[in-house]
Amino acid sequence: MAKSSRSKTSKAWLKEHFNDPWVAKAQEQGYRSRASFKLLEMNEKDRLFRPGMAVLDLGAAPGGWSQVAGQLIGGRGTVIASDILAMDALPDVTFIEGDFREEVIYEQILMALGDQRADLVMSDMAPNMSGNSAVDQPRAMYLAELALDMAERVLEPDGVFLVKVFQGEGFEDYRKALQSRFKRVVSRKPAASRARSTEVYQLGFGLK
């Protein structure tokens, strides 16, 4: 019975995915995922990218956000992408495969940054969803906490932190944690986010 239920859920997801206008738009414009449009919209509102900056993209695969960063910054800055999953190469993006919680991967990230700190740390990480919010929400919050920890370690004092968070248990506490660490915190729900999704992006500007 459970297997049948999962099969129905998978079929429904596939139908939604292939009928999604943002997925079609991504394919037409050569972006790796619909997530690219979320970042493009947030950049229009918040001017996240500028020439010469250093960007760290956590949980980057398949590369939708790194692709945008690479295009907007080009060879005039540094874009570092990290994920435990493999990712096809992108122009002007340095990819580091592995778990950034591990010291060896963290050191590789620092080496890629060189003598600079990151101007923008961004995370679109999400766990593999089971459909059980009691399981999924803590996993999602844990990933957001990992991203925040990394941001505090590598960000410039006036840097920006962009992270995906899911509304639910732990969300308000996480937002308070951001407000205690950053001078300004704003929420964003891009048009390319699915309406039924509880995801909401948090932006922290300038470490306190």
Swiss-Prot record:
Residues of the active site: K164
Compartments (UniProt record): Cytoplasm
Residues that bind S-adenosyl-L-methionine: G63, W65, D83, D99, D124
Pfam families registered for this protein in UniProt: FtsJ
Top-level division of the source organism's lineage: Bacteria
Function: Specifically methylates the uridine in position 2552 of 23S rRNA at the 2'-O position of the ribose in the fully assembled 50S ribosomal subunit.
Name by which UniProt lists this protein: Ribosomal RNA large subunit methyltransferase E
Source organism of the structure: Alcanivorax borkumensis (strain ATCC 700651 / DSM 11573 / NCIMB 13689 / SK2)
Gene: rlmE
